[in-house]
């Protein structure tokens, strides 16, 4: 199931606005990531850019630090939601989404290990390098989103 964890605590839609329209109880149920995971639903994250951030690090932070009790997910589930599950949802998991022999080696090198930082510091992790098919793709500081799009478009390469 595709989700957009960027909408959790989305600054353009204050909680009070959503609560006024939906009521507090229903507003809190808009992104029940923990409920989905506990029930075995495979979730993949994405973005409505430019309406929400296209930054997967922000999505992981929002999913792990979900403000509603019981709806936060583990770092492992959040990483899987942003990697393998996305390719599973698009029927491309046999080629991408995990590091295995025979698959494209598309990956990022992060400034810190998401499993070792405090959950509240996940948002501070930076992408240091992007690799497409195992090869470095310029400096990520130049234009990581253009590089990521190029990687997505090279599906059949």
Model-derived segments and their meaning:
Residues 137-152:
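Glycine- and charge-enriched low-complexity intrinsically disordered segments
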Residues 1-116, 120, 125-133:
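His/Asp/Glu-enriched, well-ordered alpha-helical/loop segment
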